[in-house]
Amino acid sequence: VEDIKAFNQGMNNTTTALDLLKIYEKLAVGNVINSEISKEMVDILKKQKYDDIIPKYLPKSIEVAHKDGWINGVRHDSGIVFLDDNTSYVLVLLSKNFEDEIKGADLLAKVSLEIYNSLL
């Protein structure tokens, strides 16, 4: 995250795919604080307005609770994909150094679709 005050003090906000995976796995089973709060968080994430990566090519019947992000050359999306059979999976897509961020986001969306199709 571009946090200028932190950066000027030699700090930088970072995450890893594993960090995000662990958070979303806990959310998916209701283990972030408690099941009620986890459900509230998932409901908020289902209202994400930017759907140009994980959900972009998925069938409209598939719900996704996710959070994307972008800063200079970086595109990310991570979340829980809820399948029609009441199962779900966690997907974390992190990238950097795309020359064309729009094409990069579309490539990540295609990766999301491939993963979805492989799990059917």
Identify the function of each model-found stretch.
Residues 17-70:
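Conserved active-site loop region of the serine DD-peptidase/beta-lactamase
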Residues 1-24:
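Mid-domain, small-residue-enriched loop/turn segments at the edges of structured enzyme/sensor domains
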Residues 8, 29, 99:
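Conserved short-loop catalytic and cofactor-binding motifs
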Residues 52-85, 89-106:
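Short, Gly/Ser/Thr-enriched beta-strand-loop segments that form substrate-interacting elements
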Residues 22-29, 96, 113-117:
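Short glycine/serine- and small hydrophobic-enriched flexible loop segments
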Residues 13, 85-87, 111:
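Structured catalytic/translocation cores of nucleotide/phosphate-coupled proteins
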Residues 105-120:
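Surface-exposed amphipathic alpha-helical segments
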Residues 10-17, 34-38, 71, 100-108:
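Solvent-exposed, acidic/flexible segments
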